[in-house]
């Protein structure tokens, strides 16, 4: 029995957002295939996620060194710790997010900022940083209206690349990715594209 954390980074309704359809399909199929697992859903748009700033930066540094924190620093660190600990305690983590303006929604970026903690998700060594979450399974679920997997747009795609890079930096070696793309670029094939993506999500979820 495993604990799986589902992180949702889109508050648009499913009928308006393919990434939400993808997230919901993966979630439903995962629950069906793994009835004994503990599923925790985290909707980032329903959380209070202050941007990382001086109090959180100084506070996490001082906490790591065992120094006393100011009241403001302690509050900021407590927010980050809440999400970091939840992430660390999960055996598997699923991220559902769209490509917006070539990158990820700001709430997801802020959430990942909270996870980026020396001594927790990575450590410094003389040879460079080393990730610490290697045994955690990660799934990335992304939808984008255009085609970014190939062609001239491929090099400017900074959503899946960013999240995958951060998880890799944290040491993740077991990552699954499901992407639905091109449904806006090719509207005559949109239904077919989306259906194929949801079918792929179901397959990946059943084995994840």
Swiss-Prot record:
EC assignment: 1.6.5.-, 1.7.1.17
UniProt enzyme class: oxidoreductase
Superkingdom of origin: Bacteria
MF terms (GO), sorted A to Z: electron transfer activity; FMN binding; oxidoreductase activity, acting on NAD(P)H as acceptor; oxidoreductase activity, acting on NAD(P)H, quinone or similar compound as acceptor
The reaction(s) this protein catalyses: 2 a quinone + NADH + H(+) = 2 a 1,4-benzosemiquinone + NAD(+); N,N-dimethyl-1,4-phenylenediamine + anthranilate + 2 NAD(+) = 2-(4-dimethylaminophenyl)diazenylbenzoate + 2 NADH + 2 H(+)
Pfam families according to UniProt: Flavodoxin_2 (PF02525)
Family stated for the protein in its record: Belongs to the azoreductase type 1 family.
NCBIfam families, sorted: PRK13556.1
Subunit structure: Homodimer.
Protein name: FMN-dependent NADH:quinone oxidoreductase 4
